[in-house]
């Protein structure tokens, strides 16, 4: 699910847009737009089946039958079902209001709170392949309509020239003539218009304005204080001078998880706000100075799970951006949050117990960083293999395969080569040549990203991705590579 919109005139009516609009290489594809009219008891499919990613839904506050949808569209290919769509009959039929080209979708959509006929649409030209990402192109731009989407004008006065990437647009609820645009460009920055988008002034080009725009393109004016602006990103930033200077919002404790993607401030009392992060949902009752974690939402994502041979057996798993964990499979009072024990940090991936010594646990985080931990003594040892003087740099996948052979009790890890350890990771031997395609065109991560480079191990390619030792013959080993 990429976006949710509640009909403020009929709160039991909720619109859901599917598909992830934050376009990493692991995003999910949606199946269109859905609606419930009974508070979520039943949902009805309302169309846009080929949209793949819906970034925003806006219900006209003066007429609930009028709904606007920002369709970001396909990530991996051209597609025609993208742009700005509108229904005037509650979703029975749809018309496309704004379209640029097959590689450009609508990544952000905003409505003037005082005039529902005025809309701002941020169009984004982008494409991802299996080995590369391009943010930006001739299709990107910011558009405005004053007649409910029937006609559009491209806005440019004061906005950066050259190649534009992703844009986030927002209109101040307390000062509707003030419009904000977070623009990815050669020097990404926050821009502000005080004349309804006719002219723009650069407010801030702090580094945080350009941090991973495909992942953190979000700007949120406070609904009560005209000069207070929030910028979610790696952390939540706030400006109290209309967007000139940003600093961390949390100043008095109550930490929250990093990577903030969703944000809401109550228009009735702006002390109350909600923050969606890689660690779940947080709530603040003091403008973000302190935060409380909503611990009753089971929204963690496991990469891998395993079990040991204890009685009762234990379950091990690695969580997306939330470390590695261990818990018993049964408990007289049932399994509770308190039964889970943390064993590792970072993005947790493979986590499993040693077959011959149950006190030893192996866990890893991104890029092949593997550890062996002793649960009795608390000792942690970093056991990742490194290249020697005769070997080029190793290419480890974001989700590096680590395997414990059932037949041999040997440990395996894959980069572009396969490594084996017969002493629980204390030493390693390389037992293969390069098993990947070793295609240099698929190893240019430093050039990937388009307007903004995105050089992280999340995009490492031509690597070993999975390993299995035969359960019958330890000399037979299978690997999967690209």
Identify the residue ranges that each predicted region occupies.
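Beta-propeller blade termini and top-face loops
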Residues: 1-482
């Amino acid at each position: 699910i990429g976006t949710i919109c509640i009909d403020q005139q009929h709160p039991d009516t909720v619109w859901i847009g599917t598909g992830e609009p934050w376009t990493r290489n692991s995003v999910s594809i949606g199946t269109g737009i859905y609606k419930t009219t009974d508070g979520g008891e039943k949902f009805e499919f309302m169309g846009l089946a080929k949209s793949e990613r819906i970034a925003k839904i806006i219900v006209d506050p003066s007429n609930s039958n009028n709904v606007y949808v920002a369709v970001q569209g396909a990530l991996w290919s051209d597609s025609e079902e993208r742009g700005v769509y509108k229904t005037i009959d509650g979703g029975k039929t749809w018309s496309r209001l704004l379209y640029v080209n097959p590689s450009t979708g609508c990544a952000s959509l905003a409505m003037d709170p005082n005039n529902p006929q005025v809309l701002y649409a941020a169009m984004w030209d982008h494409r991802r392949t299996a080995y590369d990402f391009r943010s930006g192109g001739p299709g990107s731009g910011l558009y405005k309509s004053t007649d409910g989407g029937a006609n559009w004008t491209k806005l440019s006065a004061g906005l950066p020239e050259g190649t534009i990437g992703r844009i986030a647009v927002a209109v101040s609820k307390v000062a509707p003539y003030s419009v904000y645009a977070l623009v990815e460009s050669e020097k990404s920055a926050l821009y502000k218009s005080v004349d309804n988008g006719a002219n723009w002034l650069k407010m801030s080009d702090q580094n945080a304005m350009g941090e991973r725009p495909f992942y953190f393109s979000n700007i949120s004016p406070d609904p009560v204080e005209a000069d207070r602006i929030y910028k979610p990103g790696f952390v939540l930033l706030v400006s109290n001078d209309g967007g000139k200077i940003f600093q961390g919002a949390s100043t008095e404790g109550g930490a929250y998880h990093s990577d903030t993607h969703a944000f809401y401030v109550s228009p009735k009392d702006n002390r109350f706000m909600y923050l969606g992060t890689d660690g779940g949902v947080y709530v603040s009752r003091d403008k973000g100075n302190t935060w409380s974690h909503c611990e009753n939402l089971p929204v963690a994502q496991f990469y891998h799970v395993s079990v040991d041979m204890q009685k009762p057996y234990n379950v091990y798993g690695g969580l997306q951006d939330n470390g590695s964990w261990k818990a018993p499979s049964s408990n007289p009072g049932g399994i509770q949050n308190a039964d889970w024990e943390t064993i590792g940090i970072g993005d947790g991936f493979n986590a499993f117990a040693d077959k011959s010594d149950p006190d030893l646990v192996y866990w890893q985080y991104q890029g092949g960083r593997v550890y062996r931990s002793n649960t009795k003594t608390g000792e942690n040892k970093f056991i990742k293999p490194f290249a020697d003087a005769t070997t080029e740099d190793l290419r480890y996948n974001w989700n590096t395969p680590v395997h414990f052979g059932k037949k041999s009790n040997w440990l395996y890890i894959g980069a572009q080569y396969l490594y084996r350890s017969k002493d629980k990771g204390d030493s390693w031997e390389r037992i293969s040549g390069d098993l990947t395609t070793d295609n240099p065109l698929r190893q240019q991560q430093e050039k990937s990203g388009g307007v903004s480079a995105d050089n992280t191990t999340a995009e490492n390619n031509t690597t070993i991705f999975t390993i299995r030792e035969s359960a019958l013959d330890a000399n037979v080993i299978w690997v999967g590579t690209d």
